[in-house]
Amino acid sequence: MKLIVGLGNPGTEYAKTRHNIGFMVIDRLADESRVSTEKNQHKAQICQITIGSEKVILAKPQTYMNLSGQSVVALMNWYKLSPDELFVITDDMDLPPGVLRIRKNGSAGGQRGLKNIIELLGTQQFPRMRVGIGRPEHGAVDHVLGKISEAEAELINPAIQTAVEAVKVWVLEGTQAAMNKFNQKNKKKKEKEQPEAATDQLLENK
């Protein structure tokens, strides 16, 4: 069994905000399996799906972002799961909108939901996937709690579907396989964008 946790804030006022990308990925996974996260358990909305032959619990903690660890640790204890059977999905301001990054472990990197999970779980040795939302010049709080713009949606909506596919690869093939497949895609995307940006700069300098 695996536990896939998407981080976000509960309530309609936070729906479709940048900070709730984790919830959006969970909802897409549930929709594909024609189920919904209506069951409430250990301060989370959950449901169970099957990926391949693997049973998977999808969870959206309802504790608010900064207390996500309360729900995650309770669910892991209930289902008797180890940290390597946990996969956390969250937003990341340090990545451009729509870019994914999968890691085997690591620090919270300023993401408070991840920070709380690490503190309460007592380890940072669990895989996670970050979905980029970009960093504003100022007003970080307003940015993460703001609604996704139409321009951003053109990048983020496809990334949500890509994140769904990445989850499936993680469940079936493991973290390294997911990293190899999806982090490499992001690298190629960045490499493609960099020459274009350099060309634009040359034109501006003329």
Swiss-Prot record:
<feature type="active site" description="Proton acceptor">
    <location>
        <position position="19"/>
    </location>
</feature>
<feature type="binding site">
    <location>
        <position position="66"/>
    </location>
    <ligand>
        <name>tRNA</name>
    </ligand>
</feature>
<keyword id="KW-0694">RNA-binding</keyword>
<dbReference type="GO" id="GO:0005737">
    <property type="term" value="C:cytoplasm"/>
</dbReference>
<keyword id="KW-0820">tRNA-binding</keyword>
<feature type="binding site">
    <location>
        <position position="14"/>
    </location>
    <ligand>
        <name>tRNA</name>
    </ligand>
</feature>
<dbReference type="InterPro" id="IPR018171">
    <property type="entry name" value="Pept_tRNA_hydro_CS"/>
</dbReference>
<dbReference type="InterPro" id="IPR036416">
    <property type="entry name" value="Pept_tRNA_hydro_sf"/>
</dbReference>
<comment type="function">
    <text>Hydrolyzes ribosome-free peptidyl-tRNAs (with 1 or more amino acids incorporated), which drop off the ribosome during protein synthesis, or as a result of ribosome stalling.</text>
</comment>
<feature type="region of interest" description="Disordered">
    <location>
        <begin position="182"/>
        <end position="206"/>
    </location>
</feature>
<dbReference type="Pfam" id="PF01195">
    <property type="entry name" value="Pept_tRNA_hydro"/>
</dbReference>
<protein>
    <recommendedName>
        <fullName>Peptidyl-tRNA hydrolase</fullName>
        <ecNumber>3.1.1.29</ecNumber>
    </recommendedName>
</protein>
<feature type="binding site">
    <location>
        <position position="64"/>
    </location>
    <ligand>
        <name>tRNA</name>
    </ligand>
</feature>
<comment type="similarity">
    <text>Belongs to the PTH family.</text>
</comment>
<dbReference type="InterPro" id="IPR001328">
    <property type="entry name" value="Pept_tRNA_hydro"/>
</dbReference>
<feature type="site" description="Discriminates between blocked and unblocked aminoacyl-tRNA">
    <location>
        <position position="9"/>
    </location>
</feature>
<dbReference type="GO" id="GO:0000049">
    <property type="term" value="F:tRNA binding"/>
</dbReference>
<comment type="function">
    <text>Catalyzes the release of premature peptidyl moieties from peptidyl-tRNA molecules trapped in stalled 50S ribosomal subunits, and thus maintains levels of free tRNAs and 50S ribosomes.</text>
</comment>
<dbReference type="GO" id="GO:0072344">
    <property type="term" value="P:rescue of stalled ribosome"/>
</dbReference>
<dbReference type="GO" id="GO:0004045">
    <property type="term" value="F:peptidyl-tRNA hydrolase activity"/>
</dbReference>
<feature type="site" description="Stabilizes the basic form of H active site to accept a proton">
    <location>
        <position position="91"/>
    </location>
</feature>
<dbReference type="GO" id="GO:0006515">
    <property type="term" value="P:protein quality control for misfolded or incompletely synthesized proteins"/>
</dbReference>
<keyword id="KW-0378">Hydrolase</keyword>
<keyword id="KW-0963">Cytoplasm</keyword>
<comment type="subunit">
    <text>Monomer.</text>
</comment>
